[in-house]
């Protein structure tokens, strides 16, 4: 399950955590800690004849209580050890290097060599191939391949360039080729790598609101049991005198009873559950800025998902040329290829390839043609080519319609029918026009990912609503939404529309999760309850989000929700088990403990425990051992299942509630039998 080194370190750390200062952080286990000290003191008082407490029995209770505290410390230390192991590999990437600070951005030779730790926000640095990027920053000039394996674990280099949504670079990563001019956006101690190390080490982990609320409940229960246990000494003393039988309960038994009844199981494992949840997220290559974000992921009931890359494969391909009447398919293909020759997008290249495959169109001499390429812009929403008094454009239907009309041409109704047909089938239509005459439509096919419909069905079973966000027209969006099985969609989405959609759902009481990578996504990311920024995205997007996906995979959002729900399920399941345990231990111990005073209670000794001493020892041994048994479950988490919340609650109540009631009866009886056979009691 874990490396031997982590086990060894956890054993050492669990002993160090016996410090009173550290024990104060966990009030429930502090009760056990104080009980262990008192039992140890009573043993020595009995040993020297100062007290009437049985020295051998008291020593056994004291040792078991100390082991209970150590087991709780061990659970937390194991979880922290896994984080430290991950942090150690990250620390290897964080080292002080010499940076070339530019005095003048236009003169790459005028540099000052400065330690990376001395860089300040706004400094401009020049980084060459095979050099480490000294600090987090934004690329303002150049384009290069960057090895980010130290951060993401992915060996394939990625492109980082100025402008667009791939301009953010991380300190500690290495340039594989070319050069970059970077504006520093973080100082030493506040970099992305520093935040990662702090999070995985748990140094900056704060208790979440749910965790605090649960701890308040556990402390309240502990105080109630403490009050009840404290009254037992005078009560049993009075009762034994009145009954003329039995004797008052000993202080050792009061301590042992209190520990058995207090919610020590969940109290011991609560911290490790939270740390392990954060660790599982880190293993998925996601950095959460707080535990609150992970909990929110578990409560999310609305997911906003980008169509491209999440629902569809993201690389639309040209599949057909659909000419209008009077135009041949080859004529349309020829014009479409010419308009796409300088288009470096996947869609543009697929148009060129389709024309070659269908009609063997190739080998053009653009110099002889005096060709001038027209790039795509967000304003015109078209691209094309001008050559020898010919003008070809391709683009969105409404953009081409406006272009044709503005130049005195006629946009054929037949083209509208073709566009509607393509959009209705879930494709993207691009209209081609030559010399102000519409030639036809290129059918770009968007392929829905395999298995995505089943995943959305699982989410629906859990009560999570999925909404597809796309820039496509409503007809295309509706067709893809129907094929993918999402609940709703937002077509022709703008940053303002996304922000308003999130606010609308939040006003209705929903928790919303979304992903984003661009500066234009920042307002919506800042508004969302769970906001996952892509590592390849801009600095603004990363700062707006409360999580960063190092793999920059939009589908990761679904996995993040699963991890969040698993964390909440694990905490809830083990809390249920712990409380059920306490009820079972109460009914197992109390009758045996007091039937000396009240013989009628003998009828309630259903397990036939040998004696009060045996009952207490058996219960307190079980109380300690169950912590060790449940450590793997607290670290791994309760198995996640896609089903409605009501069914999930019923299932967990059956397994962990009923199981928590039955397990102590069986285990305590077996331990009692073992102690009797060994002659210990």
Swiss-Prot record:
Q: Name one GO cellular component term.
A: plasma membrane
Q: Does the keyword Cell membrane apply?
A: yes
Recorded topology in the membrane: Multi-pass membrane protein
Signal among keywords: no
Q: Which residue windows are coiled coil?
A: none
Q: Which GO terms describe its molecular function?
A: ATP binding; ATP hydrolysis activity; magnesium ion binding; P-type potassium transmembrane transporter activity
Q: Which CDD domains match?
A: P-type_ATPase_K
Q: What does this protein do?
A: Part of the high-affinity ATP-driven potassium transport (or Kdp) system, which catalyzes the hydrolysis of ATP coupled with the electrogenic transport of potassium into the cytoplasm. This subunit is responsible for energy coupling to the transport system and for the release of the potassium ions to the cytoplasm.
What is this protein's record name? Answer: Potassium-transporting ATPase ATP-binding subunit
Gene that this sequence comes from = kdpB
């Amino acid at each position: 399950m874990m490396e031997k080194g982590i086990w060894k370190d956890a054993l050492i750390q669990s002993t160090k955590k016996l410090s009173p200062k550290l024990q104060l952080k966990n009030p429930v286990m502090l009760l056990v800690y104080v009980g262990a000290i008192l039992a140890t003191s009573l043993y020595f008082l009995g040993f020297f004849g100062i007290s009437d407490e049985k020295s051998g029995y008291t020593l056994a209770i004291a040792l078991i209580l100390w082991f209970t505290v150590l087991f709780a410390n061990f659970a937390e230390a194991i979880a922290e050890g896994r984080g430290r192991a991950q942090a150690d590999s990250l620390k290897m990437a964080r080292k002080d290097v010499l940076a070339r600070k530019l005095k003048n951005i236009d003169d790459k030779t005028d540099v000052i060599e400065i330690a990376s730790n001395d860089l300040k926000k706004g400094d401009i640095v020049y980084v060459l191939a095979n050099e480490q990027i000294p600090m987090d920053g934004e690329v303002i000039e150049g384009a290069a391949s960057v090895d980010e394996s130290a951060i993401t674990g992915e060996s394939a280099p990625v492109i980082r360039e100025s402008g667009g949504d791939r301009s953010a670079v991380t300190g500690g990563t290495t340039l594989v080729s070319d050069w970059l001019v970077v504006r520093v956006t973080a100082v030493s101690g506040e970099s992305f790598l520093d935040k990662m190390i702090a999070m995985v080490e748990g140094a900056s982990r704060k208790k979440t609101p749910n965790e605090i609320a649960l701890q308040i409940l556990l402390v309240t229960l502990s105080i109630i049991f403490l009050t009840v246990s404290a009254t037992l000494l005078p009560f049993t003393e009075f009762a034994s005198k009145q009954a003329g039988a039995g004797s008052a309960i000993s202080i050792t038994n009061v301590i042992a009873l209190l520990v058995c009844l207090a919610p020590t199981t969940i109290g011991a494992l609560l911290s490790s559950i939270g740390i392990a949840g954060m660790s599982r997220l880190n293993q998925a290559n996601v950095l959460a800025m707080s535990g609150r974000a992970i909990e929110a992921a578990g409560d999310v009931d609305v997911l906003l998902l980008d169509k491209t890359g999440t629902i569809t494969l993201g690389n639309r391909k040209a599949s057909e040329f659909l000419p209008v009447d009077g135009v041949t398919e080859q004529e349309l293909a020829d014009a479409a290829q010419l308009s796409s020759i300088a288009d470096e997008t996947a869609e543009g290249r697929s148009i060129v390839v389709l024309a070659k495959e269908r009609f063997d169109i190739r080998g053009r001499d653009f110099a002889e043609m005096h060709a001038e390429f027209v790039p795509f812009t967000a304003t015109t929403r078209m691209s094309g080519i001008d050559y020898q008094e010919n003008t070809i454009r391709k683009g969105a239907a409404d953009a081409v319609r406006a272009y044709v009309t503005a130049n005195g041409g006629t946009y054929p109704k037949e083209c509208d029918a073709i566009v509607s047909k393509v959009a209705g089938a879930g494709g993207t239509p691009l209209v081609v026009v030559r010399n102000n005459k519409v030639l036809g439509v290129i059918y770009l096919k968007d392929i829905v990912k395999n298995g995505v419909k089943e995943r959305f069905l699982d989410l629906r079973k859990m009560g999570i609503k999925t909404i597809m966000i796309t820039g496509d027209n409503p007809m295309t969006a509706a067709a893809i939404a129907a094929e993918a099985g999402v609940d709703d969609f937002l077509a022709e989405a703008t940053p303002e529309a996304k922000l308003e959609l999130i606010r609308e759902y939040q006003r209705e009481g929903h928790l919303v999760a979304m992903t984003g990578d661009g500066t234009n996504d920042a307002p919506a990311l800042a508004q969302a309850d769970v906001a996952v920024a892509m590592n390849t995205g801009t600095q603004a997007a990363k700062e707006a989000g409360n999580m960063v996906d190092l793999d920059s995979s939009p589908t990761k959002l679904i996995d993040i929700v699963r991890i969040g729900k698993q964390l909440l399920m694990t905490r809830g399941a083990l809390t249920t088990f712990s409380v059920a345990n306490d009820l079972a231990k109460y009914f197992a111990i109390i009758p045996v403990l007091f039937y000396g005073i009240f013989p009628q209670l003998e009828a309630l000794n259903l397990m036939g425990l040998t004696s009060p001493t045996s009952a207490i020892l058996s219960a307190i041994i079980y109380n300690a051992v169950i912590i060790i048994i449940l450590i793997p479950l607290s670290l791994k988490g309760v198995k996640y299942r896609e089903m409605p919340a009501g069914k999930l609650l019923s299932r967990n109540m059956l397994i962990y509630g009923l199981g928590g009631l039955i397990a102590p009866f069986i285990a305590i009886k077996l331990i009692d039998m073992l102690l009797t056979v060994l002659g210990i009691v």
